[in-house]
């Protein structure tokens, strides 16, 4: 009889052990899922958290963009790339350790696409940069007694030639910025020099493209001079003729203007009475600089990634 009882209870104990093991596996799985979800939530909180020095970042970007805009406005056409490049070197040297010295919505966008900047910070950078450019406009307008008045009638105008110039120049510039920032061993002075030099090269490259485009437009005008008529907006020539150069910066383009007919003839600083100064801030500049920044920054990431794989 004792033997029969033992044989009956053995399967029950085995079943109990299996059930206990299953419960343990279930508990472990639940704990693992909870741990993963907790880690993800912490990561989201970290990405959306604003830095403690946000006000310092905003003020630094306002001041930096203000200085860069003034440099772009008062630089001569011949040496503008050098003057603006030196101005950016100075800006990076003084505020680079505070905000990174973007002073350019396109640079901010490019770094964001490279995942070098939190999404929550992008509106603050853009707002500060445009505020700095507007401060420069107000200052110049007050110094000229209202002679520096802007018109935004050309905001929706689109020229593929101007788009190409801005895109190529911005791509070259941000490619250089990404390369400098990747080199952690470079000191602050070296970074300032490298970033300023990248802007110079970007302006020179796009400026050379601009000269070819202008030459082509002038040759076409001379060929069709007998049938040339004034456009509806009062202009005689295509828009490419009125562009003194590229901006590579949507904030700076807010203050930079296209030349008027009188300025083309006399190289004057201010337009003649009754003429409009059209702001370079337009859809073509915005789209070209943002796309160019994303292309330049991510192209460097691709090249640098392939280089690491080969090593």
Each predicted region: which residue ranges?
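Membrane-interface helix-loop junctions and terminal tails of multi-pass membrane proteins
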Residues: 2-311
């Amino acid at each position: 009889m004792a033997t029969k009882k033992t044989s009956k209870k053995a399967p029950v104990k085995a079943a109990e052990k299996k059930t206990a093991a299953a419960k343990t596996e279930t508990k472990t799985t639940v704990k693992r899922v909870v741990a993963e979800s907790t880690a993800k939530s912490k990561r989201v909180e970290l990405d959306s958290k604003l830095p403690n020095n946000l006000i310092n970042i905003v003020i630094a970007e306002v001041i930096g963009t203000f200085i860069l805009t003034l440099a772009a406005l008062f630089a001569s056409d011949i040496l503008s790339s050098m003057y603006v490049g030196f101005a950016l070197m100075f800006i990076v040297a003084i505020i680079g350790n505070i905000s990174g010295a973007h002073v350019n919505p396109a640079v901010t966008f490019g770094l964001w696409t490279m995942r070098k900047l939190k999404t929550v910070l992008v509106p603050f950078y853009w707002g500060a940069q445009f505020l700095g450019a507007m401060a420069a406009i107000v200052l110049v307008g007050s110094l000229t007694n209202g002679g520096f008045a802007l018109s935004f009638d050309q905001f929706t105008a689109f020229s593929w030639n101007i788009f190409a110039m801005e895109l190529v120049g911005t791509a070259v510039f941000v490619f250089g910025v990404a390369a400098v920032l990747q080199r952690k061993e470079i000191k602050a002075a070296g970074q300032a020099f490298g970033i300023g030099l990248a802007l110079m090269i970007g302006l020179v490259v796009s400026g050379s493209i601009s000269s070819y485009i202008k030459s082509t437009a002038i040759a076409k005008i001379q060929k069709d001079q007998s049938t040339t008529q004034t456009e509806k907006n009062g202009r005689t020539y295509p828009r490419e003729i009125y562009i003194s150069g590229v901006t590579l910066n949507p904030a700076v383009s807010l203050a930079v203007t296209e030349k008027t007919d009188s300025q083309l003839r006399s190289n004057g600083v201010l337009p003649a009475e009754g003429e409009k100064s059209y702001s370079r801030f337009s859809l073509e500049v915005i789209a070209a600089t943002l796309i160019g920044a994303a292309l330049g920054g991510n192209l460097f990431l691709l090249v640098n990634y392939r280089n690491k794989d080969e090593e």
